[in-house]
């Protein structure tokens, strides 16, 4: 692993590298939480020049049809970590690569990605957790059902659990328009890919 990566950055990357499921939460509270899988597949170092992940989020019964595809980059900024978010310009080309066709990710390059300004997540270590929130400024724009909103993300990451809460907020009233109303999704790691980091 690169000597320029801090111990905390590497620790967060190890904990994030994997396939996560909220099956237990979905069983406990089916009216509010669908059964979802979210995969953070480590990218070859050459793609972003450091620690990056290809991300797919899908309903558990339809892993081959992800409803969210993204690329994230972990960087050290001061005494914290920043998660930079990108969207693939041709998402169909990479569909399924988080699980079944991971070797194809070696063909991914920065030219295949569009950076999402205002959508960085600022992360701090708090005891045994990494805690992150969307950067200030309400600039991470998301259009949902024809309505412009801004994304507000919070996340908690521990060794085996990843909790996230994405909410779309009205830019005028700052009230929630979309997203889980019953609190964050709680994902448990079911597959570990940390051995693939920084290859």
Swiss-Prot record:
- Gene3D superfamilies reported in the protein's UniProt record: CpcT/CpeT domain
Q: Which InterPro entries match?
A: CpcT/CpeT, CpcT/CpeT_sf
Tell me where on the tree of life, at the top rank, the source sits: Bacteria
Tell me the GO molecular function terms. Answer: lyase activity
Q: Which Pfam families does its entry note?
A: CpeT
The EC number of this protein is 4.-.-.-
CDD domains xrefs: CpcT
Keywords assigned by UniProt?
Lyase
Please indicate if the UniProt record lists Lyase as a keyword.
yes
Annotated function: Covalently attaches a chromophore to Cys residue(s) of phycobiliproteins.
What family is it from? Belongs to the CpcT/CpeT biliprotein lyase family.
Q: Report the PANTHER family cross-referenced here.
A: CHROMOPHORE LYASE CRL, CHLOROPLASTIC (PTHR35137:SF1)
UniProt-recorded name of the protein: Chromophore lyase CpcT/CpeT 2
Q: Which organism is it from?
A: Synechococcus sp. (strain JA-3-3Ab)
Gene assigned in the entry: cpcT2
């Amino acid at each position: 692993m690169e000597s320029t990566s801090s111990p905390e950055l590497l620790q967060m990357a190890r904990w994030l590298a994997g396939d996560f499921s909220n099956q237990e939460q979905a069983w406990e509270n089916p009216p509010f939480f669908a059964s979802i899988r979210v995969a953070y597949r480590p990218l070859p170092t050459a793609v972003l020049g450091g620690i990056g992940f290809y991300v797919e989020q899908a309903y558990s019964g339809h892993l081959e049809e992800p409803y969210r595809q993204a690329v994230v980059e972990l960087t050290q900024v001061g005494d914290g970590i920043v998660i930079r978010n990108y969207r693939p310009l041709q998402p169909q080309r990479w569909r399924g690569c988080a699980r079944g066709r991971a070797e194809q990710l070696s063909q991914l390059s920065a030219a295949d990605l569009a950076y999402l300004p205002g959508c960085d997540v600022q992360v701090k270590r708090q005891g045994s957790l990494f805690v992150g929130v969307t950067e200030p400024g309400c600039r991470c724009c998301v259009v949902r059902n024809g309505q412009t909103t801004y994304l507000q993300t919070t996340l908690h990451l521990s060794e085996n659990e990843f909790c996230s809460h994405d909410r779309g907020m009205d830019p005028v009233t700052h009230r929630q328009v979309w997203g889980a109303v019953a609190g964050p999704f709680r994902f448990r790691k079911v597959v570990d890919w940390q051995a693939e980091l920084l290859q």
